[in-house]
């Protein structure tokens, strides 16, 4: 029965079927609907490319799936790490749902700004240009920032500190390698222009990295 909301039994606040529906709609909208659309853009693209991905996409997805699995496992199977305070859990849950959608919109903005140059694998196109407008004015990899915001939202909404730690840690490891590979490819393509651009921008998080 929907009223029992067993799948979201991570705290008292998430036993509410309205909260359960809100979480699952948000999670599926991000992880399955939106990210499937992002992947389909690559399938439709027909551009001569220099693929320098080096399996970084595969590594990232492996880390993301691992993080999501651990986050849900801790949320459902490790009550010792659950947030017992209803008021705090309510705040974190609400913040988490908001962040999932903020991340989706920020990633969408980044993808639309990059246009045809956005791909889910690291590659250089024949007519590749350095985009420095929109979110790329301040961040070199803002689409990843959007994903991180959504990941943070999922972790907060699940209401388990250990799950939050693991999902953030694994995704950070995945993006750390991905960005390393991508930076090498972009520096090779754009040379000093990219070096100058990198000196006045951040990788993923403003004022942090």
Language-model-derived ranges and their functions:
Residues 121-147:
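Active-site-proximal inter-transmembrane loops
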Residues 1-125, 152-209:
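Membrane-anchoring alpha-helices and their flanking helix-loop junctions
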């Amino acid at each position: 029965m929907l009223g029992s909301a067993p799948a979201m039994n991570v705290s008292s606040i998430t036993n509410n079927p309205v909260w359960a529906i809100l979480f699952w709609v948000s999670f599926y909208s991000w992880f399955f609907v939106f990210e499937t659309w992002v992947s389909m853009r690559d399938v439709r693209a027909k551009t001569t490319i220099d693929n320098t991905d080096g399996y970084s996409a595969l590594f990232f997805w492996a880390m993301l799936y691992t993080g999501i699995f651990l986050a849900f496992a801790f949320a459902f199977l490790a009550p010792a790490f659950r947030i017992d305070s209803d008021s705090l859990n309510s705040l974190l849950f609400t913040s988490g749902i908001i962040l999932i959608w903020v991340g989706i919109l920020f990633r969408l903005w980044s993808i639309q700004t990059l246009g045809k140059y956005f791909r889910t694998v690291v590659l250089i196109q024949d007519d590749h240009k350095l985009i420095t407008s929109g979110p790329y004015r301040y961040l070199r990899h803002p689409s990843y920032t959007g994903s991180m915001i959504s990941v943070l939202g999922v972790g907060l909404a699940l209401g388990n500190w250990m799950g939050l730690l693991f999902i953030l840690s694994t995704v950070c490891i995945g993006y750390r390698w991905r960005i390393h590979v991508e930076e090498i490819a972009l520096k090779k393509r754009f040379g000093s222009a990219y070096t100058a651009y990198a000196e006045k921008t951040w990788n993923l998080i403003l004022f942090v990295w």
